[in-house]
Amino acid sequence: MDKHYPVIDTRSIVMRWGDMDAVGHLNNTYYFRYLEQIRLDWLESLGHGIDPSGCGPVLAGTACVFRKEITYPATLDISIELEKLGRSSLKLRHHFYRRDDPGVVYASGEVTLVWVDYQAGKSVAIPEDIRAAVETAAKSAA
């Protein structure tokens, strides 16, 4: 998960005191919550919120490798990188950086999203405007 792909966006998250576990570092479940939050923010910035009556992404897979502990306080910059753009799926990679330590990767993550018709429960093509935005951002980053 160390490989870097074209960065199509970067989002920031401010760690909260309650995001720590008893050991005093960011609880491992919050890495996944942070990925979820930046993913939803990014999709909303493209004009696509979650509409349970229509079509949208579902999480088909996710993983995270914890490289260095993150302690409070911290502002995190999390990259959104394009690994693969398919007909109905999108594979993204992520790197977690502390704003006060920008050259160090604290964690690496990945997610696979599949666009589905929520009512029919079947995969559908990624909307053309999302596809175009992702392709344009990936070309600009290359």
Language-model regions: role of each:
Residues 12-16, 65, 112:
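Generic structural detector for well-ordered beta-strands
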Residues 27, 46-47, 138:
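Short, flexible helix/strand-to-coil boundary loops that buttress conserved ligand/catalytic motifs
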Residues 42-91, 104-106:
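Hydrophobic beta-strand-centered segment that forms part of the acyl-chain substrate-binding groove
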Residues 24, 80, 121:
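Hydrophobic pocket/interface hotspot
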Residues 2-7, 11, 70-72, 83-142:
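HotDog/MaoC-like acyl-thioester-processing domains
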Residues 1-41:
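Catalytic strand-loop segment that frames the active site of acyl-thioester-processing enzymes
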